[in-house]
Amino acid sequence: MATAANTATAAGAAKDAPPAPTKSLSGIVKQVLSGDTVVIRATKGAPPPEKQITFSHVLAPKLARRPGAGGDETKDEPWAWESREFLRKKLIGVEVTFTFDKPANSNREYGFVWIGKDKETGENVVESIVREGLVSVRREGRPTAEQQTLIELEDQARAAGRGKWSPTASAADKVRNIKWSHENPAHLVDIYGGNPVKAIIEHVRDGSTVRAFLLPDFHYITLMISGIRCPGVKLDADGKPDLSVKVPFADEARYYVETRLLQRDVEIRLESVNNSNFIGTILYPKGNIAESLLREGLAKCVDWSMAVMKTGTDKLRAAERFAKEKRLRQWQDYQAKTPAFNSKEKDFSGTVVEVFNGDAINVRLSNGQVKKVFFSSIRPPRDQRAVVGTDGEEIVKAPPRGKNYRPLYEIPHMFDAREFLRKKLINKKVQCNLDYISPPRENFPEKYCYTVSIGGQNVAEAMVAKGLATCVRYRQDDDQRSSAYDQLIAAEQQAIKGLKGLHAKKDNATLRVNDLTVDHSRIKVQYLPSWQRALRTEAIVEFVASGSRLRIFVPKDSCLVTFLLAGISCPRSSRPALNGVPAQEGEPFGDEALTFTRERVLQRDVSVHIDTTDKAGSSVIGWLWTDSGANLSVALVEEGLAEVHFSAEKSEYYRQLKIAEDRAKAAKKNIWTNYVEEVPKEKTVTEEEKEDKVVAERKVNYENVIVTEITETLTFFAQSVESGSKLESLMSKLHADFQSNPPIAGSYTPKRGDLVAAQFTLDNQWYRAKVERVQGSNATVLYIDYGNKETLPTNRLAALPPAFSSEKPYATEYALALVALPTDNEDKEEALRAFSEDVLNHKVQLNVELKVTGSPNLATLRDPTTKVDFGKQLVAEGLVLAEQRGERKLKELVDQYKAAQEAARVAHLAIWKYGDITQDDAPEFR
């Protein structure tokens, strides 16, 4: 008995003794697995050790399990998500103190967690979640003191109806409807439309791949972070992670992301899809996680996924550049490629003078030097038979091509690419910024590659966006690329998506061109008759062989033909050695003539009139007008770079040519440098003297006109009434053309004498105009179809399309015949006011009384109904003076004007009210 009593006493003492002390540790909560389980990591180490703690004495509702994750799909138990979220929001990233114990028959470690470093003062997390009614307390056996406290807290939660004990909450409402998979991932990307969506990161596979829930619809996605790639786990032959192989910085990158994103509230911007994975940007409180990884050297930029990013690619590149310069982590062995750039080569601006086949241009600098500029990181359309290397060069030659192979026309889309550049750039100012120098290789010289901009737009990007060029693909560590490479890739993706140009599904047919420079037989029979009938034919100058010999492309007939300028004889230019033919020296000023013609017409839109062919029938001969409306034959003659050929005598342009030649001779220009004018043996009779001898009678041929403008010198502009419908048609087409193809502001540099399009201030419509003066950023223009003048900023001027330059001006300037304005300013203003009231914007009848060389023709105006002569009426009202003229044919009209003036003087009208104003011109008043 005593022994039994002693034994009982000992047993009772053992039960009353406190439990064995458990070890207390501190750490940071990394992850919340459920309402009763957390993962805590140590505060030191990268990555640090971790411990999973399950709360003692409580049981949380089980979260849903995705299919394939170790079993079949299961649903949330009611309140499971709320329980998990309570802990997540309270604990993630928070330093805690915890105790744990591992029962002998369990693989789990159970314990308690307190917020902070001191469990005596810190919040007991297990008690807090019980108090909220989000877990159940285990009630088996004799409860310990801690367990009894939890039971009491649970009873209080039940009584208060908190959490899962709420009598009003529906259990079904506390179960998530999770979308574990997506049949059409791209559709989900389209739904969110690139807008940030709230999300929670649930798992970090590696530094650049995570799994997340998109809220509030609980789409479960695997997300590859846009624009970057972090080191990841190596896979074995079965495609499973091979943990035996350690990839440098893989664990560090994953840890970096876990500490900032795992189970944090973030925003995700979905941008694309790759297989079943989504591609997007993760935004957290400190910005874009991709940018942070790059700055730490834990990630590298990836071109293909940067292309899908909406914004921020420049920041990613800058972050990677920072890590490279600091040689951080992955870049610890990085060696920068620093090619030496001359400052003049690096950045410059100039005018484009020639476009090559889709990938290069010639730019003339302010000092006259011409530089060949290649576009960075793009390649033009190419022969599909060729194999292209990573740097854009053909590394496997295409099969041999024919003797007359012309890649511009025979390679699909090459002509479209060239035309895009030609229309956009020729004779326009561009900015060139050097990106890299491509080293020389077999058959390819060194290339200077630039980003070329016009009006702030990247030309290469515009080409790629239209499907007229493709991007060069580089090795990931190759920095020799365009400074706007990411924009180029993005533009290419859009072109592919839109099936534009090279990316269209239909077969890329070549441009069918009839090359009449090779096959001459069809010129006379098939083409010449229609060209001769046409007043003007639109063409493109493809090549200039000499000052007067060109090769033109006629789009209407899709043919190439050699074109010789009519009416002139031009010195022969020099020729380099080519294909075994020795070099040939040119005639004096032959090269200057070649340069003159190249600068004005090479790759420009021109209009031509073809008269005939040469003797061999291999070339056509005709007249060519530049895009500014100048006759090129006349321009060459006037510059002293050609002389008039005898064949021009029967041409309608002979007089213009002779006048131009006389001017060149007088100025001793170029070929006329040593010209000595012959002394005339007989007196030269002027045109007016000839006319006086032959014509003694005044010719009357009234034309119906509308006066559109009156100048302060009493000249006026008039339009023929018969041409009104043609003018309206021309203006409608011009306005429509500029509306559909608006010019780039500032891309055109006007020069005095240019025929341009000007945007009129009052209605902002475009009209034909001639530049009369350029001062700084302003230009004074004459609207040639109306006669009014205006001073405009040069950015309101644009090159006039060739289709609108061939028609003559619809407004003609005349001087009011036989009258002169008074010298007094007030009298002058009164005369102009009266004349304007009589004729401005009115339909009147006009008769040319005298043709004057170099000045407006003299004309009289009369009322079509009353037949009143407006000039004589102004004289009769004493507003203007009658002019004394000596032409015999005008004698009768001059006498009538004098009689009207005498009557006004006697009546003391207007300017005569104080007497005879002509007496002021007497010698005693001078």
Swiss-Prot record:
SUPFAM superfamilies: Staphylococcal nuclease, Tudor/PWWP/MBT. GO terms for molecular function: endonuclease activity, active with either ribo- or deoxyribonucleic acids and producing 3'-phosphomonoesters; nuclease activity; RNA binding. One of its GO terms (cellular component) is cytosol. Disruption phenotype: RNAi-mediated knockdown results in defective spermatogenesis. CDD domains: SNc, Tudor_TDRD11. Expressed in adult ovaries and testis (at protein level). Endonuclease which shows activity towards both DNA and RNA substrates. Has a role in translation regulation throught its association with the with the RNA-induced silencing complex (RISC). Plays a role in spermatogenesis probably by negatively regulating piwi expression in the germline. Together with piwi, might be involved in transposon repression in the germline. This is Staphylococcal nuclease domain-containing protein 1.
